[in-house]
A protein has these predicted regions:
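Non-catalytic, C-terminal membrane-associated alpha-helical segments of glycosyltransferases
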Residues: 235-328
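Conserved donor NDP-sugar-binding/catalytic core segment of glycosyltransferases
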Residues: 92, 127-163
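Acidic donor-binding segment of Leloir-type glycosyltransferases
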Residues: 47-92
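Short, well-formed alpha-helical segments that are part of the catalytic scaffolds
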Residues: 37-50
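Catalytic donor/gating beta->alpha subdomain of glycosyltransferases that bind UDP-sugars
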Residues: 190-258
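Short beta-strand-to-loop acidic/aromatic patch adjacent to the donor-nucleotide binding site
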Residues: 115-127
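Active-site nucleotide-sugar/metal-binding loop of Leloir-type enzymes
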Residues: 101-118
Length: 328
C-alpha cells in the first residue's frame, strides 16, 4: 500500500463488483442471536413484521434463554412461517462478543446463502421504522461498492426525547449489520471475538469495498437499551470495548482519544475510563491480538487519518478513493 490509506486488496473488490448483477433481487435473510430478551423482543419482532419489504427468511437462535423468550419466539414462529427458531443449550451466562457470533453462525449454518442477495445480523433489542429495510436496500442498489450499511442508533429518554448513541460513519452498526452476501463472503465473515463489529468494516476497505452508516430520519432506529449494557453493566461493557480495541490492533494513542470522546456519553467520565482500562489491562496482561499484520497496518493508517482529519472526513476520503479505484 503505497500512499496513506489507499485501499488494500482492491483487485478482490474489483472481482467482486464485476460479479454483482445490477438487477439482483431484494431477497434478504435475517439471523438473530438472542438471550433473555423478553423485555424487548416483541418490539423488534413487530417492527420487522411491519416492514414495507419483509425478509424472505428469519432465523432466530435462542442462546439458552432462562426468561419467557422461548415462549414468545414460539408464538411468532407458529404465526409466521418465514420465522425459524433454533434453541441452543444454556451455557449459564450471557456471552457477548464471541458468544454472540457463535450463536449467529449456528443460525447461519442452517441457511443456504446462495438463495439470498443480502444478509442481516439483527439484535432483538431494536425498534425499526417501517421502511427501514426498503431504504437500506435502495442504498445498496444505488451503490455497488457498498458492502454493508445501516442507519444510526438512538436512545429514547424517559421524557420521550431521542438522543444519538454517536456511532461513527465508517461501518454498519453491530446491532443491525446489513451485508451484500457476496461481500460478506469476500471478507471471510465475522471474527469470533470481541471487536468483530469493527474488524469487519476495515476488512471491507482492505478488499476495496465500502462499509458505512448514515444518519437520516427514515433509517434512524431505537436501541431499547444503551449500547454495551447487555452483560452485567455499562462499566463491564466499556471495559470489554477497550479489550476489543486492543484485540483488533488499535494504537494506544487512538484508544486514548476514543476514551476521551466517550467520557461525554452516559455514564459520564466513567465510561471513557472503562474503555482505556480495558485496553491497558489487555496490553499489560499480554492478551492475544488479531494476528493479521496487514490488517493491523491498514487499521493504524486509518486511525491516524481519523485523528488528523476527523472520523467522518477520514471515512469519506477512504470511500472516495475506493470508488475512484473501481472507475479506472
Amino acid at each position: 500500500m503505497g500512499r496513506l490509506g489507499a485501499p488494500e486488496g482492491s483487485v478482490s473488490g474489483m472481482e467482486l463488483l464485476s460479479g454483482i448483477d445490477r438487477k439482483e433481487s431484494r431477497r434478504y435473510v435475517i439471523v438473530s442471536p438472542c438471550r433473555d430478551e423478553e423485555r424487548f423482543m416483541r418490539q423488534t419482532l413487530e417492527s420487522v413484521l411491519a416492514q414495507t419489504v419483509q425478509p424472505a427468511a428469519w432465523v432466530i437462535v435462542d442462546d439458552g434463554s432462562t426468561d419467557r423468550s422461548p415462549r414468545i419466539l414460539a408464538e411468532y414462529a407458529t404465526k409466521y412461517p418465514f420465522i425459524k427458531v433454533i434453541p441452543r443449550e444454556n451455557r449459564g451466562r450471557r456471552a457477548v462478543g464471541p458468544g454472540v457470533i457463535e450463536a449467529f453462525y449456528m443460525g447461519l449454518d442452517t441457511v443456504n446463502l446462495d438463495d439470498f442477495d443480502y444478509l442481516c445480523k439483527l439484535d432483538l433489542d431494536l425498534e425499526l421504522p417501517p421502511s427501514y429495510f426498503e431504504k437500506v436496500l435502495e442504498e445498496m442498489e444505488a451503490d455497488p461498492c457498498l458492502a454493508n450499511f445501516s442507519g444510526k442508533p438512538y436512545l429514547r429518554e424517559k421524557d420521550g426525547r431521542l438522543t444519538s448513541e454517536r456511532f461513527g460513519d465508517e461501518n454498519a452498526v453491530g446491532a443491525i449489520k446489513f451485508y451484500r452476501t457476496a461481500a460478506f463472503r469476500s471478507i471471510g465473515g465475522f471474527v469470533r471475538q470481541v471487536g468483530w463489529d469493527g474488524i469487519d468494516g476495515h476488512m471491507c476497505r482492505m478488499k476495496g469495498l465500502i462499509a458505512r452508516s448514515e444518519d437520516r430520519p427514515e433509517i434512524r432506529f431505537i436501541h431499547l437499551r444503551q449500547m454495551g449494557s447487555s452483560q452485567e453493566s455499562i462499566w463491564v461493557g466499556r471495559v470489554r470495548w477497550g479489550f476489543g480495541k486492543y484485540y483488533m490492533g488499535s494504537a494506544l494513542y487512538y484508544v486514548a482519544a476514543v476514551a476521551f470522546y466517550r467520557m461525554f456519553d452516559k455514564p459520564y467520565v466513567v465510561g471513557g475510563w472503562g474503555i482505556l482500562y480495558g485496553y491497558l489491562r489487555a496490553m499489560l496482561t499480554g492478551a492475544p491480538r488479531f494476528e493479521d499484520k496487514v490488517f493491523r497496518r491498514h487499521l493504524r493508517r486509518y486511525e491516524l487519518e481519523s485523528l488528523v482529519f476527523g472520523k467522518r472526513r477520514a471515512a469519506d476520503r477512504y470511500h472516495r478513493r475506493i470508488r475512484l479505484s473501481h472507475e479506472r
